[in-house]
Regions:
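A structural signal for conserved, well-ordered secondary-structure elements
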Residues: 1-367
Length: 367
């Protein structure tokens, strides 16, 4: 008996509480990590300046990164904590430095120091006398231009030539718009899938599938928070990708459930047994398709550039979560929803009537 045969005959619905608890523990761990360290939000969602340094003639990447860090911590008077050596200077907080092939990307957040105190750009309106939004943007653009000029001069002195510096600024209003658009995109995708499954199968199947998708997204967020992976537009693309990919495995399970329920021989079979059989029948397909996809994504995560890795890591989390929910959560959730709504429909209706030869009322139940 091979492993798939053993797994095929397992009692998945009966272990639903255990499998759900495992997912909840991961999600809770992600929430705790988010409360402690926060999400590693990219510049698209926070606003700020991103400086890219392209070093074509540099052979020692580690040395170049150290040189770049020394400039950030020394010449700019700004440390990675955002503290300014000169209290009169307005400096952006340095969030991180990442290596992307030959490009070194410095991401500066929206926190500034003014008169020795940290001031968030969202709260700088009281600090400026007029045109808060315009002035906030102008200050950031001016800093961006200064960074370009100073960093270019510094690196050219160190490496003579072959160094190009460029920067981009994302304002707070733009960051809010990107975040709002991302949330809408995910919500619309989930809503469309709910409608599709409700039409193709049943409303309860659709609800179970949507709960499984929400589980997948929450696991992706939790793991991303635990490992402090950057949350940017690439991450949103990964979420939408997983929503579209993982729903296929879930649909296969519900398609098998529908097929079994149509058979005359299954009319007296319980929902639990039908769900277990449907999971067992589709288990091999779900595992193998997920595994083959994972192999390619893992290779991208290992050998890809930083930008590709930022996409690959959430995809890996999502693929595992998707297979987990398709096998262990979606169908059992459907069983419990069916049980819940059947109980709601079959509540006993109490009628008072007198029994023969007695004055005591009798309670009759309508099934």
């Amino acid at each position: 008996m091979n492993i798939f045969t053993k797994l095929k005959n397992a009692k998945y619905v009966q272990k639903f509480i255990i499998t759900l608890s495992i997912s909840l523990l991961i999600i809770i761990a992600g929430v705790v990590m988010t409360c402690v360290k926060g999400m590693n939000l990219g510049i698209e969602f926070t606003g700020g300046i991103k400086v890219s340094v392209e070093a074509n003639d540099v052979t020692d990447k580690k040395e170049f990164e150290n040189t770049l860090r020394k400039w950030l911590e020394g010449d700019r008077g700004v440390g990675e904590t955002g503290e300014s050596k000169n209290p009169d200077n307005k400096k952006f907080e340095i969030k991180n430095v990442t290596v992307n092939g030959d490009n070194y990307v410095v991401v500066l957040g929206t926190t500034m120091t003014e008169n020795g105190k940290k001031v968030n750009m969202l709260t700088t309106k009281a600090k400026f006398k007029s045109g808060e939004k315009e002035i906030t943007g102008y200050v950031a653009q001016r800093e961006s231009q200064e960074i370009n000029s100073e960093l270019t001069t510094y690196l050219q002195e160190k490496y003579n030539a072959g160094v190009t510096v460029s920067s981009s600024f994302v304002g707070n209003e733009s960051a809010k718009w990107v975040l709002k658009s991302a949330i809408i995109a995910v919500a619309v995708a989930i809503a469309v899938i709910l409608v599709y499954i409700a039409i193709r199968f049943t409303l309860l199947s659709g609800l179970a599938a949507i709960l499984a998708l929400i589980h997948n997204v929450l696991i992706m967020f939790a793991m991303t928070s635990i490992f402090q992976i950057s949350v940017n537009q690439t991450f949103i693309a990964a979420i939408v990708t997983i929503i579209g990919y993982s729903i296929n495995s879930t649909i296969v399970v519900f398609d098998k459930i529908r097929e079994l329920m149509k058979k005359p021989s299954y009319k007296e079979v319980t929902d639990v047994d039908i769900a277990n059989e449907a999971i067992g029948a589709t288990l091999k397909r779900t595992i193998l398709t997920t595994f083959t996809t994972l192999v390619m994504i893992v290779l991208l995560a290992v050998f890809g550039t930083q930008a590709i890795k930022e996409f690959a890591y959430p995809i890996i989390f999502g693929l595992v979560a998707g297979a987990y929910s398709s096998i262990l959560l979606a169908a059992p959730t459907w069983v419990y929803l069916r049980k819940l709504f059947k109980q709601a429909d079959k509540k006993p209706v109490q009628k008072k009537k007198k029994a023969k030869n007695t004055d005591k009322p009798v309670v009759a139940e309508n099934a």
